[in-house]
Curated annotation (Swiss-Prot):
<keyword id="KW-0238">DNA-binding</keyword>
<keyword id="KW-0539">Nucleus</keyword>
<feature type="active site" description="Nucleophile; methyl group acceptor">
    <location>
        <position position="163"/>
    </location>
</feature>
<feature type="binding site">
    <location>
        <position position="132"/>
    </location>
    <ligand>
        <name>DNA</name>
    </ligand>
</feature>
<dbReference type="Pfam" id="PF01035">
    <property type="entry name" value="DNA_binding_1"/>
</dbReference>
<keyword id="KW-0227">DNA damage</keyword>
<keyword id="KW-0808">Transferase</keyword>
<dbReference type="GO" id="GO:0003908">
    <property type="term" value="F:methylated-DNA-[protein]-cysteine S-methyltransferase activity"/>
</dbReference>
<comment type="similarity">
    <text>Belongs to the MGMT family.</text>
</comment>
<dbReference type="GO" id="GO:0005634">
    <property type="term" value="C:nucleus"/>
</dbReference>
<dbReference type="GO" id="GO:0006307">
    <property type="term" value="P:DNA alkylation repair"/>
</dbReference>
<dbReference type="GO" id="GO:0003677">
    <property type="term" value="F:DNA binding"/>
</dbReference>
<dbReference type="InterPro" id="IPR014048">
    <property type="entry name" value="MethylDNA_cys_MeTrfase_DNA-bd"/>
</dbReference>
<keyword id="KW-0489">Methyltransferase</keyword>
<feature type="binding site">
    <location>
        <position position="131"/>
    </location>
    <ligand>
        <name>DNA</name>
    </ligand>
</feature>
<comment type="function">
    <text>Involved in the cellular defense against the biological effects of O6-methylguanine (O6-MeG) and O4-methylthymine (O4-MeT) in DNA. Repairs the methylated nucleobase in DNA by stoichiometrically transferring the methyl group to a cysteine residue in the enzyme. This is a suicide reaction: the enzyme is irreversibly inactivated.</text>
</comment>
<dbReference type="InterPro" id="IPR036217">
    <property type="entry name" value="MethylDNA_cys_MeTrfase_DNAb"/>
</dbReference>
Amino acid sequence: MLVKTLYYRLVEGTFAKAMLVLDEKGTLYYASLGEDSNALRETLVTDFASKQRQFQLKPMVTLSNHERADYTALCFLKLMEEEEDWKNEGEESLQQKGAKRIPIEFIFGTELQRKVWQQLLEIPVGEVRYYGNIVEALGLPKSASRAVGNACGANKIALVVPCHRVIAQTGKLTGYRWGLATKKQILKMELGDAYTTLVSE
């Protein structure tokens, strides 16, 4: 089996650092959030441990031409900017545009989880969905809410695949792979004044 080389890079936004994994074309395969660079590196190694036969990871600086990867990283940083930096730019915010400009590829997850992640891509900035909404959109039985929740928790492409926009029917913020405090901060940034109406703390 041919082993594909992917490149990792650490970037720093206004509320967190992010570990990104991309290919030479700028396609994003992985994005993890955190405050500690060493912890992000350790998580990267752990998350890719089961993928060693398919992928090898190298630092981005080893890529001779990383112009496309740099562009993707720049677009990702737009997703990490404070609200006032992006909320007013015509019909679409910089945040929304940034997400649309980032090509992604799923290499983790089950078939169902990938279907859930694909559905999450349909949630616009400034809106939230309940787990039940995702179940209904995918035509799954109502009992699948837990599976949808697990899929959100298994997402390994932070922000671009917006699992942070899925909340409980009560409006309560439930688990988030990168911490509830981070989920809260992102939603406050995206929802603005609507946060207190849509989210119950």
